[in-house]
Swiss-Prot record:
This is Small ribosomal subunit protein uS13. It comes from Opitutus terrae (strain DSM 11246 / JCM 15787 / PB90-1). One of its GO terms (molecular function) is rRNA binding. Keywords: Ribonucleoprotein, Ribosomal protein, RNA-binding, rRNA-binding, tRNA-binding. Part of the 30S ribosomal subunit. Forms a loose heterodimer with protein S19. Forms two bridges to the 50S subunit in the 70S ribosome. Gene3D superfamilies: 1.10.8.50, 30s ribosomal protein s13, domain 2.
Length: 129
């Protein structure tokens, strides 16, 4: 498995698909890298030579894209900033609720997690009666 930027990219997939395993590189950037490096779109990652890997790495650094750990840190910093200034979006992130205006009376289960059933136990109900 070839390694790029500390990420092992899958060897048996086409280069454009395997580059997407790097955080911050999606379909558009992957296709751009393959085209700029002069590689065949049908080429597999295991067939890349060391020279071609270096060419791809050079193109990535030349574009000055924020990738992998730096991108994760930047996103985490953005969320912390929103939470620190107590803006609406930050509060929604902090509470684990939908941020972009979705309804929460019903739905939003992905963000809120599984239902927490609120009810009375049988012992408490029997004691009241």
């Amino acid at each position: 498995m070839p390694r790029l930027l500390g990420v092992e990219i899958p060897a048996k997939k086409k280069v454009a698909y395997s580059l997407r395993y790097i955080n911050g590189i999606g379909p558009t950037r992957a296709d751009l890298l393959v085209k700029e490096a002069g590689l065949s779109p049908d080429m597999r990652a295991q067939d890349l030579t060391e020279e071609q890997l270096n060419k791809i790495l050079h193109l990535i650094t030349e574009h000055k894209w924020v990738l992998e750990g730096d991108l994760r840190r930047e996103i985490a910093g953005n969320l912390k900033r929103l939470q620190a200034i107590n803006c609406y979006r930050g509060v929604r992130h902090r509470r684990g609720l939908p941020v972009r205006g979705q309804r929460t009376s019903t739905n939003a289960r992905t963000r809120k997690g599984p239902r927490k059933t609120v009810g009375v136990s049988k012992a408490a109900a029997a004691a009241k009666a």
